[in-house]
């Protein structure tokens, strides 16, 4: 069996990219994940990096988790088959996450990739929406608006919460 130069280059690039993703320095991990977003156009290059990218969602630093969410989003947007359980993964991440920026990014991911999961999350946290971060509230308002355009079972609840949140934002 002979290896082409092109195949060896892919293997070498995968190794070079996966090493910084496992680096102990959180900035290097985050920067590598940001780079991964930019090259999320080649499935062969991304495939060996998926497990490391998923593990970065559980990193102790929010900078790494935030960039891991973006990387998963970029990969899922281009190649759904590489991370078929990404909406469920983001939903469980969203429930467990404490950092407001990471929560907002994961929620935006759900809003773009699985509106049903985004609405499910909004319904599950409905009573605590006024106490959430403003950026997450704005994203929730957008999801409620989009959900109300459809014939949704949550339409009345969505309209009332949009009015409440809109009045909170004006003050």
Regions flagged by a language model, labelled:
Residues 1-171:
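Extended alpha-solenoid helical-repeat scaffolds
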């Amino acid at each position: 069996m002979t290896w082409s130069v092109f195949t060896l280059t892919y293997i070498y690039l995968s190794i070079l990219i996966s090493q910084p993703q496992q680096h102990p320095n959180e900035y290097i991990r985050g920067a590598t994940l940001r780079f991964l977003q930019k090259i999320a156009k080649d499935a062969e290059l991304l495939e060996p990096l998926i497990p490391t990218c998923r593990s970065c969602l559980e990193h102790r630093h929010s900078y790494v988790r935030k960039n891991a969410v973006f990387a998963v989003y970029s990969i899922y947007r281009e190649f759904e088959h590489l991370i078929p359980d990404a909406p469920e993964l983001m939903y469980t991440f969203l429930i467990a996450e404490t950092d407001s920026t990471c929560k907002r990014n994961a929620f935006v991911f759900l809003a773009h990739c699985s509106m049903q999961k985004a609405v499910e999350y909004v319904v599950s946290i409905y009573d605590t929406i006024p106490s959430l971060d403003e950026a997450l509230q704005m994203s929730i308002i957008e999801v409620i608006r989009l959900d109300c355009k459809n014939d949704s079972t949550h339409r009345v609840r969505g309209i009332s919460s949009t009015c409440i949140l809109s009045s909170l934002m004006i003050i």
